[in-house]
Amino acid sequence: MHTHEHFKSPTNEDELDDTDDDMVAGVIAEIEQDVLNESESDDDEYDLADMGALVQHQAASSSDDSISSDGSFDPNAEDTDSDDSMIDEVASAGASSAKRRKEQSADDGAGPSGSDPSGVSDYSHLDEDDETDETVRAMIAAIKKTRSAPPEIKLEDFITDICFHPERDIIALATIIGDVHLYEYGNEENKLLRTIEVHAKACRDVEFTEDGRSLITCSKDKCVMVTDMETEKLKKLYETAHDDAINKLFVLDERLFATGDDAGTVKLWDFRTKDAIFELKEVEDQITQMLTNEQNKLLLATSADGYLTTYNIGARKLYVQSEPYEEELSCMGIYRGNSKLVAGTSKGRLYTYNWGYFGYHCDMYPGIKSPISLMVPITDRIACVAGEDGNIRACHIAPYRNLGVVGQHNMPIESLDINCSGELLASSSHNNDVRFWNVKYFEDFGDIKYNEKHNAYKEKRHNLPSSKCTNASDFFADMTKEQDDDDNGGQDNNTGAGPSNIT
């Protein structure tokens, strides 16, 4: 189809020869019919995906109607709507193709985004060996990843204390309204076993007996209660055990336990008797924590007025009291084969005492410069501390090193405990939640030498495997590792090829 068969080339003055009007109209009609025939044949050849190329081809054909192969131009040619009709036909063909694909998907039963009609995601079509798709591998890894710690427990009431059962996978949660919730925990789910109503006021501390059959609780109502865990029946009630609100409990063995109140009074009790064995008041402020070693000869107590007080259990009298500190002594733990006592303070410091010499500390570590209110020994040389900043940090004892962040809360941490196997750490915060952290990886930590170089700034902010946060440096470390692998691979290939011929 060429227009130059009917038109003469223009002269230098761009004048067209006189042509019969009927001939021009006939030629234009033939051109329009040819274009329509071509568009109909192209509908079967092109799909919606090729619409762009098709329109471009048709536009070129339309331009041929006005411009001849030898460059001639007909200004008298009439405009037609053939182009519009072609576009409409192409769009209609594309819509029909899309409709057919939609009907086919419906017949296969596939939902949006790879889901079945019920809306449940189906990832069976993903190919884990498809190394070219990083997203596919990440999705499969997330699906197959198993939990290493139980899910979070959330309560409506403020959680004042938590305690693990000495033998079973049970954790007790004491609340501000005086109830104790018993949960059976597991990596997949946590199950509420029972709720025991024990006190009329806030239950400040909860402990299990050594055999795990009974719960001991103390409260702001000045009472101590011993409750059977299975039957929920009250076994023993120490009514008005103290003149002031009781703040802390500590179980020494199967027979003895100690209590401390807000006024600094410490009492020792025997489960077989009604009254306390003895009581001493050596400080004027709240007892924050109590503990003893395996020999149970000395009972140690820290207080909010900055004293570390030691009581001789056998002699039932004061053993020694430390020099006063200008900060609250809030927690403590025993390390290095029962040879070291470490106490945490409200200023974030850690004081170390040689066992038996509690008058003054032998070493001091500045710590994290944030109030430390809780401490739990993880191993003989590693402690976990927590406080008002909402972070649980691990530190190495003697020499002191910040190992990193074990876990995080959005609000200050209220209580901290570790289970009987030493693999699971639990913490509660002011947000009424309990979170679990798997700390089994600490078994592989080696001893730290005194002269070993370290970066204190990075260690304080480093996230350990149990943390829900990742380190920014890990992303670049992976990139560096991949680059090193590529470099090593290239070096091996060069080595195998023999010496270079370049001189």
Swiss-Prot record:
<dbReference type="InterPro" id="IPR015943">
    <property type="entry name" value="WD40/YVTN_repeat-like_dom_sf"/>
</dbReference>
<feature type="compositionally biased region" description="Acidic residues">
    <location>
        <begin position="31"/>
        <end position="48"/>
    </location>
</feature>
<dbReference type="InterPro" id="IPR036322">
    <property type="entry name" value="WD40_repeat_dom_sf"/>
</dbReference>
<feature type="region of interest" description="Disordered">
    <location>
        <begin position="1"/>
        <end position="131"/>
    </location>
</feature>
<feature type="repeat" description="WD 2">
    <location>
        <begin position="198"/>
        <end position="237"/>
    </location>
</feature>
<keyword id="KW-0677">Repeat</keyword>
<feature type="repeat" description="WD 3">
    <location>
        <begin position="241"/>
        <end position="279"/>
    </location>
</feature>
<feature type="compositionally biased region" description="Acidic residues">
    <location>
        <begin position="12"/>
        <end position="23"/>
    </location>
</feature>
<dbReference type="InterPro" id="IPR050505">
    <property type="entry name" value="WDR55_POC1"/>
</dbReference>
<keyword id="KW-0853">WD repeat</keyword>
<dbReference type="InterPro" id="IPR001680">
    <property type="entry name" value="WD40_rpt"/>
</dbReference>
<feature type="repeat" description="WD 5">
    <location>
        <begin position="324"/>
        <end position="363"/>
    </location>
</feature>
<comment type="similarity">
    <text>Belongs to the WD repeat WDR55 family.</text>
</comment>
<feature type="repeat" description="WD 4">
    <location>
        <begin position="282"/>
        <end position="321"/>
    </location>
</feature>
<feature type="compositionally biased region" description="Acidic residues">
    <location>
        <begin position="76"/>
        <end position="87"/>
    </location>
</feature>
<dbReference type="InterPro" id="IPR019775">
    <property type="entry name" value="WD40_repeat_CS"/>
</dbReference>
<feature type="compositionally biased region" description="Low complexity">
    <location>
        <begin position="61"/>
        <end position="74"/>
    </location>
</feature>
<dbReference type="Pfam" id="PF24796">
    <property type="entry name" value="WDR55"/>
</dbReference>
<protein>
    <recommendedName>
        <fullName>WD repeat-containing protein 55 homolog</fullName>
    </recommendedName>
</protein>
<feature type="compositionally biased region" description="Low complexity">
    <location>
        <begin position="107"/>
        <end position="122"/>
    </location>
</feature>
<feature type="region of interest" description="Disordered">
    <location>
        <begin position="476"/>
        <end position="503"/>
    </location>
</feature>
<feature type="repeat" description="WD 1">
    <location>
        <begin position="154"/>
        <end position="193"/>
    </location>
</feature>
<feature type="repeat" description="WD 6">
    <location>
        <begin position="408"/>
        <end position="447"/>
    </location>
</feature>
